[in-house]
């Protein structure tokens, strides 16, 4: 990884013109795109509160944590903002297999002038810190404790990073930015949905300047997103179908909160359902293979009832079709 370390933002963009959000704020951006800049999704719909929080991270070097249920577009939100700013963006999935060595770096044997020599290869963290890069830690609440304490060193905006193996202190690039996404807010999982997440040290949570929540959207907003991705549904009949799909999803969310079911439909699931319905030309079958088959057998009849309420059609899993 060797992008131009001296590269820096050279233009300013209006948030109102770039993201369609009513704000007079301007944000630094790059005029040229590098290989680390994500591709722009022209159909992406931005959530106002989440967008303002993330842009504050870019504009004012704030550490921003985006928390919310699965499938709501947390990581994509950061990526799509970075794409429009031409800001290099690197995502790291902080699963349990990511170790300190992966982040910091390690000694490796390399050939130099025909001889084997030991050379320290920097990990993703030291490299990112020294470059104008937006580093995004996905699944932040699933990271191992030893890894989390490595990250804690760079959570302060002016915090230097010490490479003990090299007796070297790395200063942060002026345009290095740090973001993270998580399903929980660092207090552990009380829902049972997110196995593998854990409580986060509150001293570390305190270092995040901004914590924004991106959960399920209103029916109109969710429909806007799905229709933007599925333009063939942007007609009277298609809108009615998508509206009913979102109503089914809303019932699963209410059912989950009430304790009736243990699985919920995320906006991502609804999007997949809409896409699969166009593939199979069968809304009911698409619902079953997209979501229902992932659910507990005991709960399938309840979820099939949600479908029947919205679409007026029975599924094979419905109570009326179950033979005793």
Task: Show where each model-derived region lies.
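Short, hydrophobic/amphipathic alpha-helical patches that form generic packing surfaces
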Residues: 52-60, 271-276, 288-293
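AAA+ P-loop NTPase catalytic core and its hallmark functional loops
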Residues: 1-239, 247
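C-terminal engagement/docking regions of AAA+ P-loop ATPases
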Residues: 37-41, 280-324
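Short flexible/disordered coil segments
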Residues: 156-157, 235-250, 279, 300-304, ...
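Conserved AAA+ ATPase small/helical "lid" subdomain
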Residues: 216-218, 222-289
